[in-house]
């Protein structure tokens, strides 16, 4: 009997595709969010010729849940499908409840789902001075 070759599992990918690719190119005919963005970016749209730039802004005060996973797929997936970018921005506005271990866990979970923010990792607190200025 021939030994079956073991497949290397890539976290977050099923049959070589991310959840977003499956949603947008699988059995789903259309997705209203993607359709609306395409209208805005398309000829005559208010954002014609521009790139999609989304963000996923979790608060690092606990572990992610299934609702976060859905938001990750929508935020990172929409950017991926449309050739845009997605930032990971920690909403660190409540330092009493936040912890670095949650930041690490969030990053690991996003990678497990098959996405990466590259060099676009931010904290909301990075922009506090600007927020105070504009307030």
Predicted regions and their residues:
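N-terminal Rossmann-like or analogous alpha/beta NTP/dinucleotide-binding catalytic cores
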Residues: 2-135
